[in-house]
Amino acid sequence: RQSSSKLTQPKLMKLTPTRELAIQVAEAFQRYASHIKGFHVLPIYGGQEYSGQIRQLKRGVQVVVGTPGRVMDHMRKGTLKLNGLQALVLDEADEMVSALKEGLDIIIKEIPKTRRTLLFTATMPGTIKQLIQNYMSKHVVHIEADMETVGHQGIDHQYVVVEPIEKLEVLLHFLNSKEGQRGIIFCKTKAAV
């Protein structure tokens, strides 16, 4: 939907569990909407000065991409007005619910009930089912993808669960054992790299 520069309150908010993901998603939004005059996306996350975020919120943004903690901080300060919110996207909801459930509850209770909610999750634990039951419409559309439709059949997916102190040693052993092969290693946060 095209946006006019008169819109000052966010119409869409996407919550992510980490600042790195918030930055990545905000940059993607900005690229996709670069042709829309007056369209502004603001990533809000901890570790960044409030003053710059507040200045941009006052100027007006159509999309906020943030972490629950910083979103709640702005809500408490009254610098983030969400009464015009039309859509809420919970990205990696299983990660957020396991670590940030109270924050999600606070945010969701404060935003308009008429909003559209999209929830993306890799797993469907009971906490996600409870979140759906408590805060989403009774007309939920559940879309499930399995590895046959998502993953390439020629790719070998592997994972190893280890204690945090063992991660580097196990990773080095794994990389050395796969010499000459290519792969992608995903880490939860930038700090973990």
Each model region followed by its residue ranges:
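Conserved helicase RecA-like core
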Residues: R1-V193
